[in-house]
Amino acid sequence: MSITVNQIVLHQLVKQAAEDGNVQLNTVLRNDLLQISAEVEQLMLELHQAYQGKAKGYGVFKEESLFARQLNRLLEQETDFLPFSYEAAKLLATELGKYTFAESGTLVLCQYNFLATDYLFIALLDSRISMLVDENLEIQRTQYLNINQFDIAARINLTDLRLNAQSNRYLTFIKGRVGRKVGDFFMDFLGADEGLNPQVQNQCLLQAVSDYCEQGELNKAQTQAVKKQVFDYCKGQINSGDEIALAELSEELPTLNERSFAAFAHERDYGLEESIPPLRSTLKSLTKFSGSGKGVTISFDAELINQRIIWDEAADSLTIHGLPANLRDQLRRNLTHEN
């Protein structure tokens, strides 16, 4: 897979304590764009691939978005990429300084093309210190960009924005490990509202699959087989970094009552997008039962119900026949002497 970098620049954000005790991020701006080289394209390819594998939120620009106005000027060639990057860096520094997770870092702004799609990528990368051995076999300190682990990043699908103004997914951002606050920051920085909700889309997909099997009058074993087909397809999409294509998924499934899954989903109006970002945590319920509470965590394959695992609804209990060997060994080691 090849990537074409059109324009790229790096700036620095430096964290300092302000006189009022709050955090302040100062910008150190580069005077010119980076020259496109094999190293630059390799950097962006690795950032693109790392971004693809991260959990993302989706948004759309508000009408009053300052960032969107600056971006539109760039796309209409009313300004160049370098001055656009200056405005973006200052805006990001101002907004990020309002949050406790703000840190210094290298700001990457890049306009690139991947698989016939144009993107604008924005990320704040931190630097790590490591050691190297020089040509004289001496140990030296060195700094490197941490391009595999980053939380502050957003990407705009410029092709989608240009061709489909009503899209609810052209703007994405990493949700990050610090929860909702990262989403709040990006909404403020980009001047955006929430767009596509992947959680809702995945839940609606699960409901559509269950209803499809029910209207097809499948028995439990047949239903579980269809759900496993769905999960296997979705797992493959996750592993390859791709989204769930509704039409493609439909081709993997049997036709029931002379209707394909795609036709059934459209007729019932589940509100499913043609392409859905997969969420492993939600999709695993296709083939597993799991739950936790009151000090107990249980997870098992759905096909084991009424075989090795018996559910008694009236007694509110599960009976497990054939414990996992490692659990049985722990019980013997730790509890036998107590009896």
From Swiss-Prot:
Top-rank lineage group of the source organism: Bacteria
GO molecular function: double-stranded DNA binding; single-stranded RNA binding
Keyword Cytoplasm attached: yes
Compartment(s) where it occurs, according to its Swiss-Prot or TrEMBL record: Cytoplasm, Nucleoid
Main location: cytoplasm
InterPro entries according to UniProt: Nucleoid_associated_NdpA
Cytoplasm is among the record's keywords: yes
Keywords from the UniProt entry: Cytoplasm
Recorded GO CC terms: bacterial nucleoid; cytoplasm
Stated family: Belongs to the YejK family.
Alphabetized HAMAP family for the sequence: NdpA (MF_00730)
Entry protein name: Nucleoid-associated protein Asuc_0779
Source species: Actinobacillus succinogenes (strain ATCC 55618 / DSM 22257 / CCUG 43843 / 130Z)
